[in-house]
UniProtKB/Swiss-Prot annotation:
It comes from Edwardsiella ictaluri (strain 93-146). InterPro entries: FA-response_TF_FadR (IPR014178), FadR_C (IPR028374), TF_FadR/GntR_C (IPR008920), Tscrpt_reg_HTH_GntR (IPR000524), WH-like_DNA-bd_sf (IPR036388), WH_DNA-bd_sf (IPR036390). One of its GO terms (biological process) is regulation of fatty acid metabolic process. This is Fatty acid metabolism regulator protein. Keywords: Activator, Cytoplasm, DNA-binding, Fatty acid metabolism, Lipid metabolism, Repressor, Transcription, Transcription regulation. Signal peptide: none annotated.
């Protein structure tokens, strides 16, 4: 187990998460007593208690007053906030994890972008209006793409879509910085923003879902061609 965290709390958190992931503490099992666990990890009981509370909030553990702390099946109890952690824990599964994230993004984007164009076409035009002026770089496009999709999500009238995009932000933008290093991906995105603005201007909301899905397929094809070169540190925030 290689743990990169510098602070005692960070070390304890990574130790516990990796132990759960590697089935040292499998789902359904009980964690050792607080004193034993703090000695095992090498942190104070106060630090350990803070870490356990944080992991419980993220769905990794269930803490019950007067009872031992139980390890959860995190797939069933955690939220989008653990995506980056999962990507870091299992690099070999990163391509599949990202495929799943992109599929979800395309499916929900088809819904919320159609709703945004139908209900607030002028707002949609404003959201994509500055896209042609974006700096021609991977970082700039990754930030722009996230901001556009998030703004469209909040423009649809259902803020839950926006909250989903908030939850995807970390992994979304890191993947975006790698994906948009491809000039073809940047050109495709600009064409998408432009056409979306045209559909909003002409109030053609009924054509949006197919258009977004088509964009998802085209961008997915580019992404699949880049998967073999995914940097190992993509999920750590250094890519």
């Amino acid at each position: 187990m290689v743990i990169k965290a510098q602070s005692p709390a960070g070390f304890a958190e990574e130790y516990l998460i990796e132990s759960i992931w590697n089935n040292r503490f499998p789902p359904g099992s009980i964690l050792p007593a607080e004193r034993e666990l703090s000695e095992l990890i090498g942190v104070t009981r106060t630090t350990l208690r803070e870490v356990l509370q944080r992991l419980a909030r993220d769905g990794w553990l269930t803490i019950r007053h007067g009872k031992p702390t139980q390890v959860n099946n995190f797939w069933e109890t955690s939220g989008l906030n653990i995506l980056e952690t999962l990507a870091r824990l299992d690099h070999d599964s990163v391509p599949q994890l990202i495929d799943n994230v992109l599929a979800v993004r395309t499916n929900i984007a088809a819904i919320f972008i159609r709703a945004a164009v139908r209900q607030h076409p002028d707002r949609v035009q404003a959201i994509v209006a500055d896209a042609p002026t974006v700096e021609d770089s991977a970082d700039a496009f990754a930030d722009l793409d996230y901001r556009i999709f998030r703004a469209l999500a909040f423009a649809c009238g259902n803020p839950i879509y926006g909250l989903i995009l908030n939850g995807l932000k970390g992994l979304y933008t890191r993947v975006g910085r790698y994906y948009f290093s491809n000039p073809q991906a940047r050109r495709l995105a600009l064409a998408f923003y432009s056409r979306l603005g045209e559909l909003a201007a002409s109030r053609q909301y009924d054509r949006v879902m197919d258009f977004v899905r088509s964009y998802g397929k085209e961008s997915g094809a580019i992404w699949h061609g880049m998967q073999s070169g995914i940097p190992r540190d993509l999920a750590d925030g250094h890519a």
